[in-house]
Amino acid sequence: EERQVLRFEADRIESGGLPLPTRTDGEAEKITEKEETYFYSYDACDGRRSTGKAKAGCRISAGVKAGGYRELGVVFSVCGAGVREPMLHSTGFRAEDGNPDIHTRSRAGVRMSWREMTAWQIIEEQKACRKELEERAGFSSDMAVCLAKSASQFIAKRESTGGDTILAGFPFFEDWGRDTMIALPGVCLSTRRYDEARSILRTFARYEKDALMPNLFPEGGEEPMYNTVDAALLFINCVWLYYDATEDLAFVEEMYPVMERILEGYRKGTRFGIHMDQDGLIMAGEGLDQVTWMDVRVGEILPTPRHGKPVEVNAYWYNALCIMAAFSRKRGGDGAEYERLAEKVRGSFAEAFWMEEKHCLKDVISGTDADTQIRCNQIWAISMPFTMLDPERERQVVDTVFEKLYTPYGLRTLSQDDPQFRPSYGGEVLERDLAYHQGTVWAYPLGAYYLAYLKVNGRNGEERKRAEEYVRDQMQVLESALREGCIGQLPEIYDGENPVSSKGCFAQAWSVGEILRVYEHLEKVSE
């Protein structure tokens, strides 16, 4: 078999007469060719620094001092630019009736194995898959279209359960229960992948145990881990959002016994100190178990201890009670028991969590200094479908979050004026763990912030229009994030003080999903 021959000339790199688009850490001078920015520089996770250049049809040069030495890195790929068109062939697959899973259908419909297909056939098939994803999602803005296709990369089949799941992030994370329940509304529902949403929810419903949802499915068929207080409550929220999108009451009936067990278990008490207190609020956490999303543990050190009554958990609890009251009525009941408890929770929440002097909510009720720290967790008390605060207090929370925590790339996990604030995420594992939720910017809460902002600033027509324009303008900044790190994806985190370079996972499911929910609101719901 003839080997590929690369030809290097003064102003180009060729293979078989086809000019190759290149990326280099040298200086790129544009020449007359089609330009496509397909490639961006990256290096090891948690330390990406180089931005590089992405150019097609370039003359590449680099300066070297006398007697010096420099390696010039060049990454190139083939595209259709240049003197000849590549030979493209039909992929030979067709849509199978009754099978809406794009990836399954594509694989099942190919008439030859992957090994028998040419590179161009594989490329054309993937183009067709991505085109169908784009059309199904129905977004119009370029960023939303891109994210709708990127979202599909997180949906996977889990062999140990036999069902669909959502991988939390690349390259580090598997499918975490909490992450899945936060990501699912955007990754599946906003993109109209309802079959996958049902499959995922059925998988988790099957593994419900002691009123809890799995936090992690270990490899090798081992027993799932259940150390999460929020996944089960967010499961109920996902069923509600699924019903809101599909009006599939039959699926609600299927999930209803599971949801009943969850709320009953939280009322009576279950593992990890999770139980309802006398005031109706949920308490969680005991010993060294970290059961909220701020879950870092370093040996016997808990950098962000949140044992007690976490603010977002009680927002999820109230939301779940209201959802079950609504579902009960749709099934022919009156929902009175859930409504009475929800009303009790509503009164207790406002009294226990509101800080008049700071115009926002406490982060946790624990009797420690951590209670009054200003953190991003309070934003979910405004953005959930059912909330407890009056409109004026909701507006104050959104304003405080903007003033203390907002960046265009995400929300800080802790206010910069807090003595425990850590400005950067880096160094050894211990240093990173200690900074993980102590000021580090997380991308995914940004979706909840924008939804909350649209809620409190959208109570009449003109105000709503201005709010939507503001959010659209702010989200344009995120377009640069699609070109840094992993192309077309949104990352996990950024430094707290200067959030300009992504860190952690370069592609995070809940980051993508939550921004898709905002676009869904702007492009579909508001219309």
PLM region spans:
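Acidic, mature catalytic/reactive cores of soluble proteins
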Residues: 1-527
